[in-house]
Amino acid sequence: MDSLLGCGVSAAAREPVPRYLTSQPRVSEVAMQSAPLEQPAKRPRCDGSPRTPPSTPPATANLSADDDFQNTDLRTWEPEDVCSFLENRGFREKKVLDIFRDNKIAGSFLPFLDEDRLEDLGVSSLEERKKMIECIQQLSQSRIDLMKVFNDPIHGHIEFHPLLIRIIDTPQFQRLRYIKQLGGGYYVFPGASHNRFEHSLGVGYLAGCLVRALAEKQPELQISERDILCVQIAGLCHDLGHGPFSHMFDGRFIPRARPEKKWKHEQGSIEMFEHLVNSNELKLVMKNYGLVPEEDITFIKEQIMGPPITPVKDSLWPYKGRPATKSFLYEIVSNKRNGIDVDKWDYFARDCHHLGIQNNFDYKRFIKFARICEVEYKVKEDKTYIRKVKHICSREKEVGNLYDMFHTRNCLHRRAYQHKISNLIDIMITDAFLKADPYVEITGTAGKKFRISTAIDDMEAFTKLTDNIFLEVLHSTDPQLSEAQSILRNIECRNLYKYLGETQPKREKIRKEEYERLPQEVAKAKPEKAPDVELKAEDFIVDVINVDYGMEDKNPIDRVHFYCKSNSKQAVRINKEQVSQLLPEKFAEQLIRVYCKKKDGKSLDAAGKHFVQWCALRDFTKPQDGDIIAPLITPLKWNNKTSSCLQEVSKVKTCLKF
């Protein structure tokens, strides 16, 4: 049976099927859609009110009117709700109703029933079976009308539950249409025009694909429709907190504008999600679709951000939204354990598509072989106590493909995400925003004014902050913004800071606390025969980039568990040596790129020599790339340093301390 349900078939056919229903073919989509379809009205945007009003709570036992049954989401129906529906349609014979009760046929299984299956279950009357199938088909058709379809260039036609549509049709979510996925990368890769909006749709969809496949393969996990909805919502909303130009905002701008603020976009995402729910009054809508807001909002936020700082009292399980028996649900959207999650799957496929780069990872194959296994851990405080945790595992033969996945991630970082000019443009936009920050006003809650850097403190203000701020500053008539405008005009005219070259530390990596003083080091590393040009620290930009497999210097596969065909319940680990001798020895490295803000030939010649001298003093690798310094590399002897050179390093570091 195909385990990739939800990745190309109708939403009604994505539900787990009981064993007694798997021997016969499913009802075709054609049969399910045989009833005449009315042309649906256009879905409204941003007003928070979809065409179909939210249903009453999924417990339908108290419902009697036809319209009430038509408008409820049958995926939330329990067996008793199915019996209530059948009674309402005239099937009042206890024997027939008991068939549905005894076999625990929930609403999600109704689309898979046909005459043969009903006969196998014990519905003997042909007339009764035909009448029952007709009722179920009408019900299935109404459910299809509730779902909305998006034509996505990556995943094809993807369907979303009405609750997800309510979330999508809010100003807070629509804001993602105006935030570039790759920030300044669009100025280097002309195809990289995609935004956080479509990526978020893709992650929400893939989250549903994976969790439904697990629910079908392993019904004993008791994954409910409520769980599935929450996982999809987390996927949909995981990037709500991104600022202008995506990672540029929380990775470069905020650390420089507010160095005391340890803020990341994940924090912004959970705050924006709360604002989205409250300002659009979605808690009642969530209840109407079977969610429990008090628990499920916490669960959704935990999937995005990770466990709370303060764990649950007297418990080894750090989460509050779901118990430890459903620990695997936290590994779908943002996998803190090993980094294998649907967020990566979508941006691999989507970014490669728009960048014109080949994507070699097939997420559908991973879903095909994914299953949940229980892993035992010994608790450090008490070696005798063993904690059992359920993890998403893959077949042992897939280990090579997972190494390829992380290699793909590394390649994307090298070729696109950390492209030397993409990063440079992000740096220049950051410089412009820092110049503009004191003079830009954004109206927030109760009319309070915020700056670009303080909008993260108020979600109403942050909702208004998108990539559009670039054009607002560029075209402003405020003379106070002239410096910022000059930088932005230089970006548009391709008059960029000059790239000098790239190097790497041979031994210890540069620590974060050292980053700020690196330009001073370069400025002070003046060679003996340097041109008579004075260069200051502010003339240099030193960009330190850490490239890894997603877990700093650790091998992420060491934290992945596998199962074998002979025993699908036992989780095992696979060492790197068991896979291949050609796999990397190190899983992280540091790149150091240096740029110069001055652009005249004399200054650039001097800056190049400063950079080469600095690399020699710090015992970094010979600089590569930068045309300006290429002729200067050969004469220097990196491996035979004199004591005076080492003394110079000490002098430079000593000066910088004061």
Swiss-Prot record:
The active site is at 265. DGTP 1 binds at residues 182, 239, 247, 265-266, 347, 351, 417. One of its GO terms (molecular function) is RNA binding. Residues 23-68 are annotated as: Disordered. There is a cross-link at residue 509 (Glycyl lysine isopeptide (Lys-Gly) (interchain with G-Cter in SUMO2)). Disruption phenotype: Mice are viable and fertile but show increased cellular dNTP concentrations and impaired ability to restrict retroviral replication in lymphocytes, macrophages and dendritic cells. Mice also display interferon (IFN)-beta-dependent transcriptional up-regulation of type I IFN-inducible genes in various cell types indicative of spontaneous IFN production. In addition, the replication of mouse cytomegalovirus is significantly enhanced in mutant mice. Binds 1 zinc ion per subunit. Keywords: Allosteric enzyme, Antiviral defense, Chromosome, DNA damage, DNA repair, DNA replication, GTP-binding, Hydrolase, Immunity, Innate immunity, Isopeptide bond, Manganese, Metal-binding, Nucleotide-binding, Nucleus, Phosphoprotein, Ubl conjugation, Zinc. The modification Phosphothreonine is found at residues 52, 56, 634. It is found in: Nucleus; Chromosome. The keyword Hydrolase applies. The modification (Microbial infection) Phosphothreonine is found at residue 634. SMART domains: HDc, SAM. PROSITE patterns: HD (PS51831), SAM_DOMAIN (PS50105). The keyword Metal-binding applies. Residues 77-142 form the SAM domain. Its cofactor is Zn(2+). Changing residue 112 to C: In LCH mutant; abolishes formation of the tetramer and deoxynucleoside triphosphate (dNTPase) activity. Its main location: nucleus. The modification Phosphoserine is found at residues 49, 55, 64, 125. In mouse, the SAM domain is required for deoxynucleoside triphosphate (dNTPase) activity and ability to restrict infection by viruses. It acts by capping allosteric sites. This is Deoxynucleoside triphosphate triphosphohydrolase SAMHD1. It comes from Mus musculus. The lineage of its organism: Eukaryota, Metazoa, Chordata, Craniata, Vertebrata.
